[in-house]
From Swiss-Prot:
Entry protein name: 4-hydroxy-tetrahydrodipicolinate synthase
Annotated site residues (Part of a proton relay during catalysis) in this chain: T50, Y113
Family to which this protein belongs: Belongs to the DapA family.
Gene field: dapA
Active site feature: Y139, K167
Originating species: Histophilus somni (strain 129Pt)
């Protein structure tokens, strides 16, 4: 049970980036999404992370979207900026552009495609942290990046003052204990896998950076509040209701299904994504509809 609240905790949305039918960021829809999360009790928002299609936005678009998210939030909810890149220089540029923005933290993914060694990952994150005072959250998602940031390396990185936590998306709940052992109990562990998020909180994790939260924000916030209070049986009831969503929102590559689900629920006016991502296939749509019904959202 968490007896005090760390800097980042609870149900944190990996926010989708709404687009209009010209493929441009829809800032009116974005404003409505921010309000939805504030009203629903979401504990923080990640702007332009993986789910926010950071890889297909330019640096200028990334920064503008983050700044608009901050503007819409108006201090009512912490905003974490997705600033990761597979080039260290690009990640540093993004981070520096936000130094005086008021973001609560930066989420920085393990460099993808070029497959750095553990030493390379250490040097990458160290260089980013040294260019800013903004708290840094590491992001490990080997299924996308091709590289696994090991607990031993996380332990080394935790010695850098403004590297405060990790989004761990391997789905391996044993990582909670391993990372806490290497980095210390105060190092923030946030699950990046909805399916095992509650289990990781039972083992000492402080929250979930969630895809499901985009469309079931109130339920995810309540589940995490119960878990943080040690009321795991009650939290499990909510998690059971969302279990099909946790799974089926990955029936095609994220964020394809969750963006379509948000459209189906009227949270965004269009399910449009930028190429090479395409809208959810017709054959997958009934499964998402069933999952939404099982969760009581339709």
């Amino acid at each position: 049970m968490t007896t005090h609240r760390p800097l980042f905790y609870g149900s944190i949305t990996a926010l989708i980036t709404p687009m209009n039918n010209h493929g441009e960021v829809d800032f009116n829809a974005l404003k409505k999404l921010v309000e939805y999360h504030i009203v629903s009790g979401t504990h923080a928002i990640v702007s332009v992370g993986t789910t926010g299609e950071s890889a297909t936005l330019s640096i200028a678009e990334n920064v503008k979207t983050i700044l608009k998210t901050l503007e819409f939030a108006d201090g009512r909810i912490p905003i974490i900026a997705g600033t990761g890149a597979n080039a260290t220089s690009e990640a540093i540029t993004m981070t520096k552009l936000l130094n005086d923005s008021g973001v609560a933290g930066c989420l920085s993914v393990v460099p993808y495609y070029n497959k750095p060694t553990q030493e390379g990952m250490y040097q990458h994150f160290k260089a980013i942290a040294e260019c800013t005072d903004i708290p840094q959250i590491l992001y490990n998602v080997p299924s996308r990046t091709g590289s696994d940031l090991l607990p031993e390396t996380v332990g080394r990185l935790s010695q850098i003052a403004n590297i405060v936590g990790i989004k761990e998306a391997t789905g391996d709940v044993s990582r909670v204990a391993k990372i806490k052992q290497m980095a210390g109990e105060d190092f923030i562990f946030l699950s990046g896998d909805d399916a095992t998020g509650l289990e990781s909180m039972k083992l000492g994790g402080q929250g979930v950076i969630s895809v499901t939260n985009n469309i079931a924000a109130a339920d995810m916030a309540k589940m995490c509040e119960l878990a943080l209070a040690g009321k795991f049986d009650e939290a499990e009831i909510i998690n059971d209701k969302l279990r099909a969503l946790h799974k089926d929102l990955f029936i095609e590559s994220n964020p394809i299904p969750v963006k379509w689900a948000a459209y189906k629920l009227g949270l965004v006016p269009d399910p449009i994504l930028r190429l090479p991502l395409t809208t959810l296939s017709e054959q997958a749509q009934p499964k998402i509809i069933n999952a939404l019904k099982n969760a009581g959202l339709l």
